Every structure is written in C-alpha cells, then in structure tokens.
C-alpha cells in the first residue's frame, strides 16, 4: 500500500478504478532517490507496473512522482500530482520542498529541468555525487521534491545531459541556491465554502491540512561561459574569402603565414569589436584568390589540458566551396554573352538608337525609410569592403522654403560591420530631406564602383511619439533597463540614473521593461559560475505590458522587489506557456491506488 514500511520488493503494481494510459513516462515520472539504471514503467489495463533495476537502499524512503503522466484511456484526462511513497526501513520521510525554476536572463519558466538536493553540504557534492532526492519542473517551472527527511540541504537545478544526476559538463544548464534548505511541516486550516446558489452561502467548512515548507524556492538557471579556446572550424565559402571560428573570444588576432602565397598585405580582416571569436578574411590579390587551394599556418592561443592558454600552430588547406569553372564552361559563358550582346545591338539599331553596354555596379543597400524617426540614421551596406570613398560626392539636403539646401552630416564607418557606413545628422522634426550619392562615389576592393543613389524622406514630428519614464527603487548603483516590445525583444537600453530610467521618442505600441543589476558595470548581462559561487546578474521584469499612445507620457513607479521573481514577467510575454488545462480527475482517484 502507499506509505508501506520495510518494503523489499522492486516490482510495484498500482491499480486504478478504470483503464489508464501513460503519457511520456520517461519525461514526467521521477523517482527518488534517482536510479542509475532506468526503471521499467508500463501501463496494463487498469494497472501501472514499476520495476526498479537498482538495488534498494536500506532505511530509505522511495517516492515515485507521476506528475500528470497517468491519464484515463478514453479521454486522456490526467490524474494530477499523483505520487506513491514507500520505505525500505521502519520510518517514512514525508516532508516536501517546492519552488520554481526560471531562466536567469529572461525569467522564463523552465520546463523539464531536474531539481535535486544534497545533505552533503560541500560545494563538491554537486559536481561529484548523484542527487539524493529529485524532482522535475512542469510547464510552469514548478517542482516538488517529496520524501524528504529532516535536516539541512543544498538544492540545485540541472539539465542533466548525460543523466548521471550531477554537474559534469560545462555545457549543462545549472542553478544553485546560496542559502541552506531546512524542510519543515505544520498543520494549517483552510476554509471551504458551500453555496446554495450563486449569491447565498450555505456552509463554511474548516479543514485541516499539512503545509510543507519551503514551498517558494526560486532557482535562476544559467549556462556558464565556456572559456576553453580552440579553433572550431575554418572554411572558404567562396574563392575571395575565408573564415575562422573559435570556441571562445580572444583578445588578439591569430598569426597567419601563407605557405604557398605571400600573406603580406594580402587580406582585409573583418572582425567584431572587442574580443574576437569569428574572423572573415577578404583576399585582395587576384593571384591569391584564383588559387584552388590556399595553404597556410595559423598560430593562436589554445586551452591545454591544464586549462592554460598556450600558443598552438595548425597547418590548414582551404579549398573554395564554389567549384572553379572549367575552360569549357567559361567558353560557353563567353559565347552566350556575345550572342546576347549582338542581339541587343541589332535591337538598338532597329530602333534607331545608339547601343550602350550596361555597366556592372557594386551593389549597395541603402536604409533611408520614407518616414524617418527623429533618432534614426541613414546606413549604406556593401557586399564587399571598400577600397575608396569620395566624401565630396555625398549630399544631404533639407527642403527650406521650397528650396533644397545642404545640411551638415557625419559619414562614419559602422563599429560592428566592416561593410556598413552610417550617415548621422541633426534632423529637424517634420522636415523633408533628400540624400544623394553620385555615381562612382564608392569603389569596392575588387574594382567595381557604385551607381548613383537618391532617397527622399520626411522626419517625424514629436507629437507622433510617446515617452515612458520609470521611477526605480531597489536597484543597485549600477543598473540598466531594457525596454522590450510585445515579443520580449529589446527596443532600447538606458542606464538607471538617479533612480530614473527615461525613454523618449517611442513609437506608439505595447512595451514592457527588464532591469539588470549590472554588478561589473560592463553594460551587458553576465552569466554565473558555480566554481566561484557567483550567481548570474539579477534580472527583474516590470509586471505589466504598457500601452503607449502618440503624444502621451507614462510615468511608472517600479519597486523591483515588490513581487516574487516568478510573478514578475507578464504572461503575454512568456514563451513557455502552461500546458493546456485539462479536465481533472475526481480527487477521490488520488486514494484509489493499492499496492500489490
């Protein structure tokens, strides 16, 4: 029977009043203590049969948590939170610990994560020993660990990739609580109300129940930053470009030496700002990029077996993924082009026009929307790095009293994209502008020039925008706020200054906000590290989605500690939705199981 003592049998049969089935038993059913060998769990008619493969531990409470895995066979209605407990000794441990696991960065509930406890309070227990008691989170991120004995515990979260019940791989997502967990239970009273009708109370009944604490543990899960440095991949996607991909950012460029070509001034290197993990090399020299195979040595910093950065040199052979065309294919292309040219000339003669061979231009994508935001700017993105820029051929004009007049602007290379340039100007609200670039203003490294460009646009007026101002309390001295759209994507970021986070010139729409306590002041969210007992930087959500209208200001008071973390993120922003509510079984079914 449930709660049996001195049990020695490894095969357990639970019988129900009607035919049942199991839904995803491998995912939903959790057994404590965790089993090294996977148990066999089957449904058969009105029965569930569990066969444990591990040797039973003496004087141990075993709990089998079915979550909502048991369903009636006809309609699939779940039996919620069904559990089964027995002991191999003379005492059964009956306390429980509950809580919620959230993604530390965006406070999303985390489904299917293992949560475990250790009575061994050493930090090394999490990285060397299997959990003693375990639970698993549901679609709301909620977990319950049952069959807990009195005492002090450490609690952890783990996405257990290798199913060994401890943290053994740096790629595993983890969580840990700084404070000790001390389970307890007490008797409490609740009141159930019986109604005569929708307006009249019949009876208020008092019911005693057992309350288990703590039931509000919050675990913020994260993945540690992988600092192991190695070359993941090298490739040459086209003859004129090759790339290197590293597993972690570095502070300096690797040293490249050509073995069948001269590398001196042979490349333009496209790299992100700051620390480097992805490098694109554009080959300048046509004699080099026409080679089928590029042989080179690459010296870079590599993490050795002692976790130290040491120089390492790899010899590489890079072959273009695009197959070079054969002489026969090139000859066919030339013949086809000559035929098309002759056809175009004859057509021009027939129409009495002079034939002009079309010019091939360097492609450029110009971002200059017809309606320009006050804070926005023009950008030009090219398909290859530029060899030259003629600044004098770029013109920005404002329409003043029906005349187009030149206005000052800054033309600046983009800090993140080698092939993008930005045009900044102090826009006059509500005014019209034209942006023009003469032909041949830009030349790519492979010789092509750009065509002329002309874009006209009008700048929005201030009354087309709204503003949101947050009065923030409870934040650290270094904090910033991300303004979010309805899809939880960052629209804009501002620092918290004098307990204020102000957002100006916002387009009408729905917004929410996320605050990050930026402990190291680097302007980005940083993950945690278990070895250093460093939690990820704290994230808090404003609890509402705000609807902003044009020409309207919203001022919101925001105490980041007003609500528990699991109650902060607005439901409409959450991507992890609770499983669809199903019709629940009669609660009497909870007690209908009999052990045989």
Describe each region flagged by the PLM.
Residues 1-596:
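N-terminal targeting or signal-anchor segments and their processing/structural boundaries
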